[in-house]
């Protein structure tokens, strides 16, 4: 909401990995106590009500802004993906407590990427007030599996053997 509302961002940290249900890569923000935060400046000169909206079904939280309509317009195209990085080879972890030959995936591969989100904030008369860009780097993530005795992980996979 702060990005599309044209508010100047003062602090923003993207997630380390692409998390698809958080929305468009390049527009996410991490908030984590005590240091990682998301900050923007309210430049409207008026109060701003920020309403968090939680959707438990989708597992998402969004924010709605209410206040005096600012006298600027925002042009913000979809973020671009500047480069992609393939995920590492899958990791297979031997678990002697699992049934012989069993295998269970517990984490899924995600490619890494670098993205750029841009926006132009325009005055009512069309004068450009600000051109902004958000650069984000997301690291690749490997698929992870646990397997029981007797299972043979595929060639090329990273393997953690128990008691070897």
Predicted regions and their residues:
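Well-ordered beta-sheet/strand-loop patches within structured domains
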Residues: 1-164
């Amino acid at each position: 909401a702060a990005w599309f509302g044209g508010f100047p961002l003062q602090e923003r940290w993207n997630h380390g990995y692409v998390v698809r249900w958080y929305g468009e890569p390049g527009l996410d923000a991490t908030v984590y106590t005590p240091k990682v935060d998301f900050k923007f400046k309210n430049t409207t000169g008026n109060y701003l009500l920020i309403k968090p909206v939680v959707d438990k079904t989708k597992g998402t939280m969004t924010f709605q802004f209410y206040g005096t309509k600012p006298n600027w317009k925002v042009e913000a195209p979809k973020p671009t993906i500047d480069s992609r990085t393939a995920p590492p080879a899958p990791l297979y972890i031997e678990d002697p407590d699992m049934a012989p030959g069993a295998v269970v995936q517990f984490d899924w591969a995600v490619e890494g990427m670098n993205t750029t989100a841009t926006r132009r904030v325009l005055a009512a008369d069309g004068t450009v007030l600000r051109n902004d860009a958000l650069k984000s780097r997301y690291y690749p993530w490997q698929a992870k599996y646990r397997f029981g005795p007797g299972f043979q992980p595929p060639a090329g996979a990273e393997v953690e053997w128990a008691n070897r």
